[in-house]
């Protein structure tokens, strides 16, 4: 008996992984499913690329107003393949947004949001909002002129909301003006809060799809 077979048997005896494999591989796929039904999966792949490249960049990025821009420049010019890692991160971000939009259109046009899949649609909408938040927070992290003024404009938008507007602006900025506290908050949102939030809603989304199956043709 080979070593690989022995290892498999060890796990099979304890976890019954063959049953899990059979369940995954035997799931019924309706005949009307075509390439456009892969858009959600492509969005997931883009997110995984984002996670991997973003994690790699945290080894070099310094979230301070005095060092952020220089750390990004160092990553692009001095770190081996740093330019490639950041470029892939940016390209996959654009691709993720595009695939998400196309996925939403596909689901809407094929009626995939209708009963009994309303909650699947709701989790998808929440993930779309989180994805936009990713773009807004990530755009500011290089802390160049574009990033700074983007933060200033975006964080000032809630000021138009009656009663709580000023509070929301101060909450986003970490004070009355844009500065170190703002960058720290946007960095925390971009690298911790938003990824984990998206991961939770993705899990919910996939579990519901797994339970209810793919919607039928119109």
Swiss-Prot record:
User: What does the record say about how the cofactor binds?
Assistant: Binds 2 heme b groups non-covalently with two histidine residues as axial ligands.
Primary site of residence: membrane
| Residues in coiled coil | none
Task: Return the similarity comment.
Answer: Belongs to the cytochrome b family. PetB subfamily.
- List the InterPro entries hit by this protein, alphabetically: Cyt_b/b6_N, Cyt_B6_PetB, Cytb/b6-like_sf, Cytochrome_b_N_euk/bac, Di-haem_cyt_TM
Localization terms from the record: Cellular thylakoid membrane
An example GO CC term for this entry is: plasma membrane-derived thylakoid membrane
| Membrane spanning stretches | 35-55, 93-113, 119-139, 189-209
Q: Name one GO molecular function term.
A: metal ion binding
Q: Oligomeric state and partners?
A: The 4 large subunits of the cytochrome b6-f complex are cytochrome b6, subunit IV (17 kDa polypeptide, PetD), cytochrome f and the Rieske protein, while the 4 small subunits are PetG, PetL, PetM and PetN. The complex functions as a dimer.
The cross-references to HAMAP family, in alphabetical order and at most eight, read:
Cytb6_f_cytb6
Disulfide bond entries: none
Q: What's one GO BP annotation on this UniProt entry?
A: photosynthesis
What does this protein do, in the record's words?
A: Component of the cytochrome b6-f complex, which mediates electron transfer between photosystem II (PSII) and photosystem I (PSI), cyclic electron flow around PSI, and state transitions.
Gene this protein is translated from: petB
Q: Record-annotated residues binding heme c?
A: 38
Listed binding positions for heme b 2 are 89, 190
**What UniProt keywords apply to this chain's record, in alphabetical order?**
Electron transport, Heme, Iron, Membrane, Metal-binding, Photosynthesis, Thylakoid, Transmembrane, Transmembrane helix, Transport
Sequence positions that bind heme b 1: 103, 205
State the name under which the record lists this protein.
Answer: Cytochrome b6
Task: Give additional notes from the record.
Answer: Heme 1 (or BH or b566) is high-potential and absorbs at about 566 nm, and heme 2 (or BL or b562) is low-potential and absorbs at about 562 nm.
Q: Which cofactor does it need?
A: heme b; heme c
Organism domain of life: Bacteria
Q: What does the record say about its membrane topology?
A: Multi-pass membrane protein
């Amino acid at each position: 008996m080979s070593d690989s077979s022995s290892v498999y048997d060890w796990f099979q005896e304890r976890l019954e992984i063959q049953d899990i494999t059979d369940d995954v591989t035997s799931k019924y796929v309706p005949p009307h499913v075509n390439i456009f039904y892969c858009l959600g999966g492509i969005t997931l792949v883009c997110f995984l690329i984002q996670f991997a490249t973003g994690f790699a960049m945290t080894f070099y990025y310094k979230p301070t107003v005095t060092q952020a821009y220089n750390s990004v420049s160092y990553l692009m010019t001095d770190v081996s393949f740093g330019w490639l890692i950041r470029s892939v991160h940016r390209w996959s971000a654009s691709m993720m947004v595009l695939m998400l939009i196309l996925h939403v259109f596909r689901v809407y046009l094929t009626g995939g949001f209708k009963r009994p899949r309303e909650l699947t649609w709701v989790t998808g909408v929440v993930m779309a909002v989180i994805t936009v938040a990713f773009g807004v927070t990530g755009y500011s992290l290089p802390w160049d002129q574009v990033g700074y003024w983007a933060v200033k404009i975006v964080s000032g938008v809630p000021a138009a909301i009656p009663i709580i507007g000023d509070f929301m602006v101060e909450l986003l900025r970490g004070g009355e003006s844009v500065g170190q506290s703002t960058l720290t908050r946007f960095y925390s949102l971009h690298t911790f809060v938003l990824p984990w939030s998206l991961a939770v809603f993705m899990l919910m989304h996939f579990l519901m799809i797994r339970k209810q199956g793919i919607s039928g043709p119109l």
